[in-house]
Amino acid sequence: MSKRKVAIIGSGNIGTDLMIKILRHGQHLEMAVMVGIDPQSDGLARARRMGVATTHEGVIGLMNMPEFADIDIVFDATSAGAHVKNDAALREAKPDIRLIDLTPAAIGPYCVPVVNLEENVDQLNVNMVTCGGQATIPMVAAVSRVARVHYAEIIASIASKSAGPGTRANIDEFTETTSRAIEVVGGAAKGKAIIVLNPAEPPLMMRDTVYVLSDEASQDDIEASINEMAEAVQAYVPGYRLKQRVQFEVIPQDKPVNLPGVGQFSGLKTAVWLEVEGAAHYLPAYAGNLDIMTSSALATAEKMAQSLARKAGEAA
């Protein structure tokens, strides 16, 4: 099966790590172009050393390159505002081009590979939510497939050193996009997301806490569902793991809790603690927040490439 050529817009931490993943592990993908706006960026320099074509003139530079004619999939690792413009420009030049959005822009549907990749594999633009979303939404979905989830809250704690300028500029978008995806993909009636930039030295690995309030159900069934989901995520993010056993608390009907925006709640509270260790391809191992984004994007693109190859075979 021939490989599909891809380009990455954004030569920062995420874009560079993704490039290295594709070069080392791409099964149906061929790394063709790295796009940046800073001619002195380490990402562009590294791409050139690895034999990848580059441009420092942004998406316009990409579209002016001869390689653009063969590009099937573009990863956008810029910012939410830039992605809206990039999508419009690329779509005008190539209406059928596939975009994988690693910003919080969310022009296309949210995609969390282990939960809903199959139903989004033929979309022209998919959004990878956020690092916190990729880590925690599978846990919310794991509870949702056992019991009705009324409320889910996630706290993503990441090393301050792993948060580049793009992440810092998109904090509000992070919380909004993650909260919405907890509902749309995770299945919660109401979602809330909090991000913490941890300044500790030496930097700590990404840690995530997930609280889910659901109808009462078998705790064994919920724990089994969560463990099964964690194993499924590990298939493409090997450093993803439960930090300890799942904890439960029954909230009785005669002692309900009041949830802002939800009201009185009684039922089952499920608490999940996660840790995500990065693969250290380009970024340090503590930057699991960035690794889970690039790994999820890679898994999505691989499926898209297979789908495109099948369609090309059927049309031949």
Swiss-Prot record:
Known catalytic reactions: acetaldehyde + NAD(+) + CoA = acetyl-CoA + NADH + H(+)
Binding site for NAD(+): S11, G12, N13, I14, S162, A163, G164, P165, G166, T167, R168, A169, N170, N289
EC number: 1.2.1.10
UniProt GO molecular function: acetaldehyde dehydrogenase (acetylating) activity; NAD binding
Pathway per the UniProt entry: Aromatic compound metabolism; 3-phenylpropanoate degradation
Superkingdom to which the source organism belongs: Bacteria
GO annotation (BP), single: 3-phenylpropionate catabolic process
Residue numbers annotated as active site: C131
Record keywords: Aromatic hydrocarbons catabolism, NAD, Oxidoreductase
NCBIfam families: ac_ald_DH_ac, PRK08300.1
Subunit structure: Interacts with MhpE.
Function: Catalyzes the conversion of acetaldehyde to acetyl-CoA, using NAD(+) and coenzyme A. Is the final enzyme in the meta-cleavage pathway for the degradation of aromatic compounds.
Family designation: Belongs to the acetaldehyde dehydrogenase family.
Name the UniProt record assigns to this protein: Acetaldehyde dehydrogenase
